[in-house]
């Protein structure tokens, strides 16, 4: 647990700038969560703007939740520069499987860029892994098959870390496979939990190995969610409490509460 | 009251996917309110994306709060597919009357698509009904004439349900006319109450007759607003309490608290 | 203090419509803060829409936080009409200095339009004033040189009011120089504080002299922030408390708590 807790510290110390090109639904939550986690968010999507911004950023997060042609242009320009600069790229393929446009765009980024992390729910990752999956809008879907196997083989194929969010988050870099059991159901009752997790995976990947970074990110948000749920009266009051809990999360609390399993 | 309360249950049971093409100001509130109400939101606006998404959606909500040409393209593609699939289309003509662009766009959708619901404030609906109306930005305006008559005749003309939000919400499908007295002034002190109501009208229209659905939606949000106002110290604390109150609203509470009048 | 407190009253009395073309990250916060402050927000960016909207607006706020070509088109159309109508234009050059695109766009608006207010952090204003500045994404940066001098000379050069936000906000109209010490560090731990301040500067500039208006805006938000920080457990709970505190801020509280220095 110590090594994961240290990643929390590293983010807070180095305050990495996380460049995010994301959907217009949860973008404010992503910005605030990035700050609460100890990093700095910057949102920029114009092809004219992203190259300069990537030069000073430490990670790039691409979230396709409200995709369009203009946004793809900006994402490509940013990803090209991120590749050149060698900073980690996180892809959140929101809604892959629900529409062909989203699936194909996600695949395009997977095939054309050296992604550090692909993070989605079971339906999205299942779709991209080519296994039978059901996706309904942007809700978490289901897959046939073992998520550990799917994460492992997709990670191996693309040389990146794959995160499948769920009751147990599964994380694999193609070698190791880990599970994170932290979290509470109310986290699924607010819009943006997945998007915020991707932002935070970006912050962690900016300061550490992607696999360890994603484990840390998922466990930290899960623990904060558990903490926030203690006082929340519903999804409305959960959200501010969640931001507070992420901000005040200590190493000690992380080490005590993290439920991380190494499966392989 | 029983039949309206049952619509609440139906939404929670069937969890309809509500496709929303909406403004970038209140989109996060709309997503969260849709979830709190028991439905699922999905936001998608690219012409390349919307057709696939509509195929799995149960309602389409078009909100013109921050309109532009690209968004209109996406709205038209989505509305065409919604028409083909026979799912209800809700139009929230935000700011109609304030600018010609908004008025004409709203009219275009009214004339070209079989809308299930048109929901706006007095100024917006008055403008679209061709009565003398004052609209100031996106604030609720005033109309000359009886809102019951205006809602009734506009609904009749377009074969849809018309909702005029206000201290008393007026709802008509061209045959019946109903009023909903639930709600509190602080609901007008946060941005997005009207947009959230439209999202929830979409959720209800997905599982029931539009007229009954809109009555249910307006009464449910009004009751939740009354509940939330009891503990709120201002608009800031009202908002999370409002989301909590919608989430925890029971049938019993709805039946006890709904103030619905059938005028015709 | 009396004259500043009266500006608070004037905003609440006249309820000016503040037209905002802004970034998609903090737009909801800007809308809500505008309402809490006693004004009315309207967001509209399409060239086809902005001209009609400006005709009924009392101020225009341009925030370049998530700039793109389409948005610049809308900003230019709106600024041209605002110039014609003689309403104050506030520019928030978010991220100027971080990318050339942002710097040049900010300069373009400074050179082509009669701005009433330029409001940014030290790095942004330093960049635009041509002094050595460091900017990191959209975070507040540093400048070499005296912020009072920089604000004063930039204000003089452009015939407008310049606000440099910081631990002490510096405000100058090229003649007077004032400082506002209100505020708390947690205001920098939520996304959007600067954007909300620009919106509120627009509301105040709509009803008063820009210099006095900006002093009032910065002091009022600072005092409300101090109040909200008393009960906040972190950035998450700070935000709703901040909105509540702005809404309930009284003249008496303003006069008692404002820490405004006139340096020249």
Swiss-Prot record, chains A, B, C:
SUPFAM superfamilies: Ribokinase-like. Its EC number is 2.7.1.50. Its cofactor is Mg(2+). Belongs to the Thz kinase family. Pathway: Cofactor biosynthesis; thiamine diphosphate biosynthesis; 4-methyl-5-(2-phosphoethyl)-thiazole from 5-(2-hydroxyethyl)-4-methylthiazole: step 1/1. ATP binds at residues 119, 165. The keyword Transferase applies. It is an enzyme of class 2 (transferase). GO terms for molecular function: ATP binding; hydroxyethylthiazole kinase activity; magnesium ion binding. Catalyzes the phosphorylation of the hydroxyl group of 4-methyl-5-beta-hydroxyethylthiazole (THZ). Substrate binds at residues 43, 192. The keyword Repeat does not apply. This is Hydroxyethylthiazole kinase. It catalyses: 5-(2-hydroxyethyl)-4-methylthiazole + ATP = 4-methyl-5-(2-phosphooxyethyl)-thiazole + ADP + H(+). GO terms for biological process: thiamine biosynthetic process; thiamine diphosphate biosynthetic process. Keywords: ATP-binding, Kinase, Magnesium, Metal-binding, Nucleotide-binding, Thiamine biosynthesis, Transferase. Gene3D superfamilies: 3.40.1190.20.
